[in-house]
Every structure is written in C-alpha cells, then in structure tokens.
Amino acid sequence: MTPQDFYRTLEEDGFSLASKQKEQFDTYFKLLVEWNTKINLTAITEKNEVYLKHFYDSIAPILQGFLANEPIKLLDIGAGAGFPSLPMKILFPNLEVTIIDSLNKRISFLTLLAQELGLENVHFFHGRAEDFGQDKAFRGQFDVVTARAVARMQVLSELTIPFLKIGGKLIALKAQAADQELEEAKNALCLLFGKVIKNHSYQLPNGDSRFITIVEKKKETPNKYPRKAGLPNKKPL
C-alpha cells in the first residue's frame, strides 16, 4: 500500500486528510525507520508495508466505525512504536492519548516522535500496566483502552479493564480470530465485570484477515485487580 493508496482508501471511507496529516504520517515513517536501527521497534520497515500493516491497521477501529473524533481519554497499553494510538491521534486530533510502555527506550522514541509530529494532549509513561492499574490517577479514568497484539484476552482483560470508566470500552486488535481466546477468558471477564459487546472481522486492503474485539466495563473493578506485575501472565484468571 503506497502512501497514495493509503490516502485514497481513507478518502473513499470519508476521511480526507489535510496536508499536515499527510506530512505527519510521512515523518512518522521516517522516524520509525531511523530509530529502528537503534532500538527494536518493528520488523516491518518497507514503506508500503508500514502504511498497510502499521498505519492502516492501527486506524481500522476508526474506519470500522468504533471510534469518533471526540475529546475522549484513550489509553494505549503496550503501544511499542505507538500503534494503534498515534495513527488514530493523527486522524482524530481531538483524542487525548496516554501510552504506558515497559521499555524506557520506546518512551524516548515516542516522546521525540510526538514533538516532531506536533501532537498535543499525548502523555507517555514508563512502567508496567499492573502497577499503573492500581494508581488512582489512572484507575477508572479512561473512556477507551486500546491494545494491538499485546496478549491473549484472558491476560489482556486484567491489564486493561481496571483503567476503564464504567461504560468504557476495551478495543483489542488481533490478527487471529478471538473465539477460542474469548472462551478461555470467560472467567476473567466475569471477575472483572467486562462484557464482550462486539467481535468483528474485516480485511486489510491486501486481503489479510483482522479482528476487533470490544469489551465494555459494566461495574467497578474489584480492588485486588490487576494483581502484581507478572502474575496476570503467569497465572491467568
């Protein structure tokens, strides 16, 4: 997917990008490739692949109608090189984006990236989701939490749902169908008061299958969740 294909596809979906937004995506690509030689950000560095498998893939929840251009508080867990939240932010500047990542070098990259792209209302924090999930400044504060290929739902639910307001939504982006994952996550979702409200499949322009699972938080998360760092992965609910 060339940048021109990317812009044309967005326009066909009703999103006509301004020159500034196109420049932001171009700068994003250049910085991603440059920094990838210093720290491991991505295995995908070929331009057309980045536009398809990172940029287009990241904004799919918007193109599929699951996110609006409103000043909502969005948290991205394990965003790595900023996916999916920063491409979403470029497309929808009204979003207030927070990223938590466990690797400080990635936070350094994201901080520089946001400055170079001129993004406002973006916040980056170094640490583990399990620790921030018990912090009152973060717990129960977000309208949306996004996670792209972070962990299976049984683990992911404990890392994300505590951050949501009641009625807030987890948007999980997956490369594989989530049916089996959701079956395994039933107990975790029950304990965390999360309800699956959508399990959506779609295709990238090249025909690759992708999946979005949306979970809504129904009640306040019990205080004991998330458990200490590492436990959700070692002993899933």
From Swiss-Prot:
> Which molecular-function annotations from GO does this UniProt entry contain?
rRNA (guanine-N7-)-methyltransferase activity
Keyword Phosphoprotein recorded: no
Q: Which UniProt keywords apply?
A: Cytoplasm, Methyltransferase, rRNA processing, S-adenosyl-L-methionine, Transferase
GO cellular component annotations of the record: cytosol
InterPro entries according to UniProt? rRNA_ssu_MeTfrase_G, SAM-dependent_MTases_sf
Please state where this protein is localized. Cytoplasm
Q: What is its EC number?
A: 2.1.1.-
Stored Gene3D superfamilies: Vaccinia Virus protein VP39
Report any Pfam family annotated for this entry: GidB
Where S-adenosyl-L-methionine binds, per the record, is at: G78, F83, A129, E130, R148
Q: Which PANTHER family match?
A: S-ADENOSYL-L-METHIONINE-DEPENDENT METHYLTRANSFERASES SUPERFAMILY PROTEIN (PTHR31760:SF0)
User: What family is this protein classified in?
Assistant: Belongs to the methyltransferase superfamily. RNA methyltransferase RsmG family.
The protein's job, in short, is: Specifically methylates the N7 position of a guanine in 16S rRNA.
The cross-references to NCBIfam families, in alphabetical order and at most eight, read: rsmG_gidB
UniProt name for this protein: Ribosomal RNA small subunit methyltransferase G
Q: What is the lineage of its organism?
A: Bacteria, Bacillati, Bacillota, Bacilli, Lactobacillales
